[in-house]
Regions:
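Acidic (Asp/Glu-rich) sequence patches and key acidic residues
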Residues: 1-178
């Protein structure tokens, strides 16, 4: 017997990424026709209802993250980043803000945005892949995340690494604009 064991943390990237991960599981099953056991906290694997998964799991999770940030800042607790790879550089802390993959944010501002615009609008900017398909927002958010997390803001001629990340950012921005 062949056993394939995998784990995928999808909260940081969004509902579209979660769906893509489940699609890969489906393709593996089709290729090899073996039995599967999938544990899916979002219940998407069982129900295949994208909107339900996105609103009941991902939007609730984002709301909880925003509330946690606000609570921690009110308690004067140190919280410099959310959803940030701890193996990457950490931008300098600025009081009242936290760093995320889409920039430096003020949690109170996010609460106001949720009240004024709804969680959906914030989610479309926060999650790299919030929609079912790789759409313009996916490419925009991918570019902005790379710009914030990986870019040295140096000319491509400086190094191979600079050329690769700069090209990646430009390529994704062009796809977003197309």
């Amino acid at each position: 017997d062949i056993a394939v064991i995998g784990d995928c943390q999808t909260n940081l990237l969004g509902a579209g990424f979660h769906k893509a991960a489940i699609d890969i599981v489906d393709e593996l099953v089709e290729l090899r026709d073996f039995s599967t056991e999938v544990e899916d906290d979002t219940e998407y694997y069982e129900h295949r209802d994208f909107e339900r998964m996105r609103s009941e799991h991902f939007y609730r999770w984002l709301n909880a993250i925003v509330e946690l940030c606000c609570e921690r800042l009110k308690e004067n607790c140190s919280m410099s980043a959310i959803c940030w790879d701890c193996n990457k550089y950490m931008p300098r802390g600025i009081e009242g803000t936290v760093v995320s993959s889409f920039g430096r944010i003020c949690p109170e501002h996010l609460v106001e945005r949720i009240k004024d615009e709804g969680i959906e609008r914030l989610a479309s900017e926060f999650f790299m892949w919030n929609n079912e398909e790789r759409d313009a927002l996916f490419y925009r958010n991918t570019a902005l995340s790379a710009l914030w997390e990986d870019c040295y803001f140096m000319p491509s001629a400086r190094s191979e690494e600079d050329m690769e990340i700069n090209s990646f950012i430009i390529e994704n921005l062009e796809k977003a604009a197309a």
